[in-house]
Swiss-Prot record:
Species this protein is from: Buthus occitanus tunetanus (Common European scorpion)
InterPro entries: LCN-type_CS_alpha_beta_dom, Scorpion_toxin-like, Scorpion_toxin-like_sf, Scorpion_toxinL, Scorpion_toxinL/defensin
Keywords from the named record: Amidation, Disulfide bond, Ion channel impairing toxin, Neurotoxin, Secreted, Toxin, Voltage-gated sodium channel impairing toxin
CDD domains per record: neurotoxins_LC_scorpion
Any Gene Ontology CC annotation: extracellular region
Pfam families in the cross-refs: Toxin_3 (PF00537)
Annotated S-S bridges: C12-C63, C16-C36, C22-C46, C26-C48
Cellular localisation: Secreted
Entry note about domains: Has the structural arrangement of an alpha-helix connected to antiparallel beta-sheets by disulfide bonds (CS-alpha/beta).
GO biological process: defense response
Domain LCN-type CS-alpha/beta: 2-64
Phenylalanine amide PTM sites in chain numbering: F65
Entry protein name: Alpha-toxin Bot1
Amino acid sequence: GRDAYIAQPENCVYECAQNSYCNDLCTKNGATSGYCQWLGKYGNACWCKDLPDNVPIRIPGKCHF
């Protein structure tokens, strides 16, 4: 797995306010844990620890809604 911003299908991050929301999102996707990274590169976004390789992560480039 890898530590990364978990991405939606459009390469957009999951915006957040609470660590609990991200921890739930990340662990549901197979990560060991997650938290809300405040004021990061993509604003307030969920960061996952040890996310499985088959789960999309935010990569450079635009987020397409």
